[in-house]
Amino acid sequence: YFSYNDKIIKILEAEYLNADHHFTSGTVISDKLEIACGSGILRVKKLQQESKKALSIEEFLRGTNILKDTVLK
């Protein structure tokens, strides 16, 4: 999970990509919500905001704009 705009968002489905990067862990590195983590990249596919139904990443991004270079906690 991660926190964004004071809301907890659970990652329900994701894919790990083994890729070198120079970003700080937790940094959003694409407009499709790919997140730098350790020695790879987490590509989020499905998530759920607190008190809301689960959404595909496409559905989520239609209503929420998480900008590239945002660092998630």
From Swiss-Prot:
Its EC number is 2.1.2.9. It catalyses: L-methionyl-tRNA(fMet) + (6R)-10-formyltetrahydrofolate = N-formyl-L-methionyl-tRNA(fMet) + (6S)-5,6,7,8-tetrahydrofolate + H(+). Keywords: Protein biosynthesis, Transferase. It holds the Pfam family Formyl_trans_C. One of its GO terms (molecular function) is methionyl-tRNA formyltransferase activity. Belongs to the Fmt family. Attaches a formyl group to the free amino group of methionyl-tRNA(fMet). The formyl group appears to play a dual role in the initiator identity of N-formylmethionyl-tRNA by promoting its recognition by IF2 and preventing the misappropriation of this tRNA by the elongation apparatus. This is Methionyl-tRNA formyltransferase. It comes from Rickettsia rickettsii.
